[in-house]
């Protein structure tokens, strides 16, 4: 199999990278109608598999779970989750032949083996669904020409898919049809019905492409969503302790600080996040973020370049073939860091203190979000898609750190995201340690900014620059479709 993206000519690559359209709510008047009365079989019962299935069943669809024979016989976690929630469970051979739609929600590294097992069992004219297109785009999986291939990709972890549905809402979602596999022209109808069954149509749906979803998703998770949070956590913790902060306080400020800071980001973008700072602190955070952007642009560009060329995926798949030797080694290294092993802190940190004592963290968030967005757009990815893959998902990932630090983040995200996270942070940490962290001044981290001198013209210009950045312009529009977003952050 060959990387699908690399088989396209330049015009085709640009067309698929740039495919992104915000769908009107009127396009979902039929909601789940196209799949009513049809058999939907989900392969895999992890976070996405279980929670999407629960939503789809509650939306009136016929859902069953196909699991490997060994998983059923040994009553593994996937079998227990499916049966405890009252779903029909069977082997591939029992359930796949009767399915109108087979949804593959197993981890990326299992996709090829799963598809090779289920494809011969699928009836003629059935549909195959994904929630991430890496198997199609990067691996280059070849699907039978009579099979329709679609994607519904929620822009959040599976648990959030379920929680928002229970609230009568949903999560923003990308949908797509693989242009090589839409023999009956029904792919979009299938994808729309599946998305509606998860509740996505109530939060906003983007019609995209497999290519755009994969390339933007990889870029977001490697840089701002996971890589920058990991690098920032390690750097900021070490800096706080080196400056005399109590290790427990330093750990808590970082662990809960990302979540608290990005909650403002979720509700009002970079503008609101920066507005939570005093004016002197805002000016300082802006200056720091500009320094970070200049310093880190080549690193962000390299990640985007390696994603576009397929270099990233080929390296990761080589590690799959080597039993995840690199991934598991990097995971162990992270578990041994000072931040991960910092003591608990019983003291109270107020919500505002996370901002006042975390000016550098705010600057890191601003720089990372803007850089990821800018480079995706420069590469041909449409602004709406770049927004969802940078700013929108960040509070959800930050929330995982608040639970069990970096360990929890790396458990919740996919192995693909975790592998890319380590590639980024392993370069970012020494780069910033050598060229940036030593230039910090009092008030950047762990203490409030004390300089109260304000230049009105400078403040005016900074506010204008923040509010008119392209990610803020598109973000205001997209957040208008998500007026019922619940508050995540609780602080500590």
From Swiss-Prot:
Cofactor note: Binds 2 magnesium ions per subunit.
EC assignment: 1.1.1.86
Binding positions (Mg(2+) 1): 217, 221
EC primary class: oxidoreductase
Reactions it catalyzes: (2R)-2,3-dihydroxy-3-methylbutanoate + NADP(+) = (2S)-2-acetolactate + NADPH + H(+); (2R,3R)-2,3-dihydroxy-3-methylpentanoate + NADP(+) = (S)-2-ethyl-2-hydroxy-3-oxobutanoate + NADPH + H(+)
Cofactor(s) this protein cannot do without: Mg(2+)
Record: residues binding substrate: 414
GO cellular component terms listed in the entry, alphabetical order: cytosol
Residues reported in the UniProt entry to bind Mg(2+) 2: 217, 389, 393
Binding site residues for NADP(+): 45-48, 68, 76, 78, 108-110, 158
Family: Belongs to the ketol-acid reductoisomerase family.
This protein's name: Ketol-acid reductoisomerase (NADP(+))
Organism lineage string: Bacteria, Pseudomonadati, Pseudomonadota, Gammaproteobacteria, Enterobacterales
Gene (name only): ilvC
């Amino acid at each position: 199999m060959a990387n699908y993206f690399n088989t396209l000519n330049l015009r085709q690559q640009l067309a698929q990278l740039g495919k992104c359209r915000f769908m009107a709510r009127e396009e979902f008047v039929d909601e789940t109608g196209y799949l009513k009365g049809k058999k939907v079989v989900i392969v895999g019962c992890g976070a996405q598999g279980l929670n999407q299935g629960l939503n789809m069943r509650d939306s009136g669809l016929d859902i069953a779970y196909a699991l490997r024979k060994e998983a059923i016989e040994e009553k593994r976690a996937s079998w227990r989750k499916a049966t405890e929630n009252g779903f029909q469970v069977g082997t591939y051979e029992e359930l796949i032949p009767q399915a109108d739609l087979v949804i593959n929600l197993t981890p990326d590294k299992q996709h090829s083996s799963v598809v090779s097992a289920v494809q011969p069992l699928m009836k003629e004219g059935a549909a195959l669904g994904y929630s991430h297109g890496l198997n199609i785009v990067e691996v280059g999986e070849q699907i039978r020409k009579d099979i329709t291939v679609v994607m519904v990709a929620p822009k959040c972890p599976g648990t959030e898919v379920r929680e928002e549905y229970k609230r009568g809402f949903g999560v923003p979602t990308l949908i797509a049809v693989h242009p090589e596999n839409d023999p009956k022209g029904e792919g979009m109808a299938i994808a729309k019905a599946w998305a509606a069954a998860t509740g996505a149509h109530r939060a906003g749906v983007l019609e995209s492409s497999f290519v755009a979803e994969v390339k933007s998703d990889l870029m977001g998770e490697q840089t701002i969503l996971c890589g920058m949070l990991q690098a920032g956590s390690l750097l900021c913790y070490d800096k706080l302790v080196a400056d005399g902060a109590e290790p427990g306080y330093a750990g808590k400020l970082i662990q809960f600080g990302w979540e608290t800071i990005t909650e403002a980001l979720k509700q009002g973008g970079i503008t609101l996040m920066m507005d939570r700072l005093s004016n002197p602190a805002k000016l300082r955070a802006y200056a720091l973020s500009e320094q970070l952007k200049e310093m880190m642009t080549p690193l962000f560009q390299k990640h985007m370049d390696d994603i576009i060329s397929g270099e990233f995926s080929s390296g990761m798949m080589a590690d799959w073939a080597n039993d995840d030797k690199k991934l598991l080694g990097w995971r162990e290294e992270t578990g041994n860091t000072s931040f991960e092993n910092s003591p608990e802190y019983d003291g109270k940190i107020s919500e505002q203190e996370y901002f006042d004592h975390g000016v550098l963290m705010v600057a890191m968030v601003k720089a990372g979000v803007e850089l990821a967005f800018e480079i995706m757009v420069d590469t041909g990815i449409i602004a709406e898609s770049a927004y969802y893959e940078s700013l929108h998902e960040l509070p959800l990932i930050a929330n995982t750190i608040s639970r069990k630090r970096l360990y929890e983040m790396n458990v919740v995200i996919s192995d693909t995201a975790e592998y890319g996270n380590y590639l980024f942070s392993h370069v970012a940490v020494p780069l910033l340690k050598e060229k940036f962290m030593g230039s910090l001044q009092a008030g950047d981290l762990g203490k409030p900014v004390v300089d109260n001198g304000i230049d009105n013209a400078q403040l005016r210009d900074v506010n204008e620059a923040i509010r008119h950045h392209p990610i803020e312009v598109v973000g205001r529009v997209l957040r208008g479709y998500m007026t019922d977003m619940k508050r995540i952050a609780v602080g500590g």
